[in-house]
Amino acid sequence: MFRKLTLTLCALMMMCTSVAAETLVVATNCTYPPMEFLNDKKVPNGYSIAYATEVLKRAGYEMELRDVAWDGIFAGLAAGNYDLLAASTTITPERQKAFDFTEPYYGVVQAVVMPKGKKINSLADLKSLTVGSQIGITGVL
């Protein structure tokens, strides 16, 4: 009888032991405030990060966040270096062939920023100017 009770209690204890939440590795690129940026304590912050944190929490996952360079973020995802992105990402047909996307949670348009007094009427007006852009973004001209 004692042995049966002991085995039953051991089985119950094993069933009641908390299971550690699975940790998902999430990549971001903290160069796009207010969506992804480093706060004054150099901690990743922003809407995309808060959104991913809450979704994973509600799904029962822990999150390991990595701030990575944008020009390698998709290669790292494809290589399995991380499980998902918490980064402002344009959904393109090419990217849809390689990755799954959530429903978009915000929209944005591309714009050219010029000093006051300079005017452009078309992309052709930019030919004689020096134009800067982040590597690997869809806004590259």
PLM ranges: what are they?
Residues 1-9:
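Bacterial N-terminal signal peptides that target proteins for export
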Residues 25-28, 113, 130-133:
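Short, well-ordered beta-strand segments
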